[in-house]
Regions:
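Intrinsically disordered, low-complexity regions enriched in serine, threonine, proline
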Residues: 1-2, 240
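Short, well-structured segments within or immediately adjacent to enzyme catalytic domains
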Residues: 40-246
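Amphipathic alpha-helical segments typified by the pilin-like N-terminal helix
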Residues: 2-44
């Protein structure tokens, strides 16, 4: 009977090298597959949100919900306006002043996961350029998505929001906000130049008023955002440039 021979050092090194090569080939494919799965989840999330938006509008004279624009979250009488994402609790500090269950879409959605991209770490500490390089967390840690402030003309006193019928079907209502800047998550709405995430292969998912949900590349987004005329991002009705009314 011949004794069993173990691996030689050279053979072991060859096996390790082969494993390393295979891992190098597989990891990018796995990362791409993970990203594709996250994009699919985002598309599904935003489609459900748009269904909830239209249900809300059907019950509210065709009006969009309050976008949770921070400067107008409190009404003139001091009460908090119910918004798409939350109703501000003035007795609590951030992030505890924001709660899903107080938002007007919650009764339709009823699932916190719908508000978040699987690849977005909402509690991560990041360097804020806007806040002078400080390491901070987001104030609002509920959602990866922001509503377009166009529904109130980007104004604190823009209540009530526009009617859906006043918007063009392909105007953009929701997008994935740029996660690299925590300050952009101080509320539930944004200006277009505050930007979109690039975590999906240099692009993000966006939703239009007609309920369609699409992928946009960063270069396409910023090209449209920089357009001085009314476009799908700057889309407040009744104005030439889609920005604030005069």
């Amino acid at each position: 009977m011949h004794p069993r021979r173990g691996f030689t050092l050279v053979e072991l090194l060859v096996v390790i090298a082969i494993i390393g090569i295979l891992a190098g080939l597989l990891l990018p494919a796995l990362a791409k597959a993970k990203n594709q799965a996250a994009k699919a989840t985002d598309i599904n999330n935003l489609k459900q949100m748009m269904v909830a938006i239209h249900i809300y509008a059907d019950d509210n004279n065709d009006r969009a919900p309050w976008p949770n624009w921070a400067g107008g979250d409190r009404a003139p009488d001091g009460t908090s306006r119910p918004g798409w994402l939350y109703t501000l609790d003035p007795t609590q500090d951030a992030p505890d002043c924001f709660k899903y269950e107080t938002g007007v879409l919650w009764d339709t959605l009823k699932t916190a996961k719908i508000y978040v991209c699987p690849m977005d770490d909402v509690k991560k500490w990041r360097t804020s350029v806007v806040m002078g390089g400080a390491e901070v967390q987001r104030d609002q840690q509920l959602s990866s998505y922001a509503m377009n402030g166009a529904v109130i003309g980007y104004q604190d006193d823009g209540y009530p929001p526009v009617k859906l019928g006043a918007m063009r079907s392909q105007d953009i209502l929701f997008w994935e906000t740029d996660e690299k800047e925590p300050h952009y998550f101080n509320d539930g709405a944004n200006y277009p130049p505050e930007g979109v995430s690039g975590r999906h292969q240099a692009g993000a998912i966006q939703a239009a008023f007609d309920g369609s949900v699409t992928y946009t590349r960063l270069d396409a987004w910023y090209e449209e955002e920089s357009n001085p005329n009314r476009n799908r991002l700057w889309c407040y009705p009744g104005t030439v440039d889609g920005r604030k009314p005069l």
